[in-house]
Amino acid sequence: MMTNFKFALKNLKVNFTSENIDKLRFYIEKVLLFSDRFNLVSNNVRNFDAMLLHALDSVSGLPIVKDKNPRQVLDVGSGAGFPGIVLALFDRCRKYVLLERSNKKAIFLKMISLELGLENVEVLEHNVEEEQNKYEFITIRAFGDIRKYANILGSILKSGGLIMAYKGKFDKVEFEMSYVKNLFDKVEIKSSELISDKERYFLLLYDYKC
């Protein structure tokens, strides 16, 4: 499975070293080890291969991040660290701010970022509604329907900024997009570059209007 992961990274044109791979393996093992204690992932994905697929899905957004080239990225609702920790691991030159409201998960994120030596990671523990800073790039994954949070996320998006939402089936993404398109200067659906039997898309929201 790890061989397939490396092959996928090459297809995504994501540079990596043996240290990156070793640290990713360490991270996944820690997620599995502490899942019960910190309520990190559901029972049906508590195995290494399933976690590796989550990591691969997470890193598939990196080409979009690099194309936009923000100084820092805000990952909202980081949970166990997908995609925030994974992106930070393969993109060490950029700061990643992980926003997580759960105390248990925030503790885990702080612990694992220290153990991985991710000096480019900062963990914030509060609700997204309480965030005061503005960001030029925001990521969300497994965050539910974008319609519920579009205005909240837009309010902390810098002028000219971009929200990148990891999404699944095209019909659902298109439906969500139809409700939020008037809130942003530009809305785009971009297919994932991963070779997979599952539908994966990114909903990209550019420059909040309100």
Swiss-Prot record:
Belongs to the methyltransferase superfamily. RNA methyltransferase RsmG family. Coiled coil: none annotated. GO terms for molecular function: rRNA (guanine-N7-)-methyltransferase activity. The gene is rsmG. The keyword rRNA processing applies. One of its GO terms (cellular component) is cytosol. SUPFAM superfamilies: S-adenosyl-L-methionine-dependent methyltransferases. Specifically methylates the N7 position of a guanine in 16S rRNA. Disulfide bonds: none annotated. It is an enzyme of class 2 (transferase). It is found in: Cytoplasm. Its EC number is 2.1.1.-. S-adenosyl-L-methionine binds at residues 77, 82, 100-102, 128-129, 141. Keywords: Cytoplasm, Methyltransferase, rRNA processing, S-adenosyl-L-methionine, Transferase. InterPro entries: rRNA_ssu_MeTfrase_G (IPR003682), SAM-dependent_MTases_sf (IPR029063). This is Ribosomal RNA small subunit methyltransferase G. The lineage of its organism: Bacteria, Pseudomonadati, Spirochaetota, Spirochaetia, Spirochaetales.
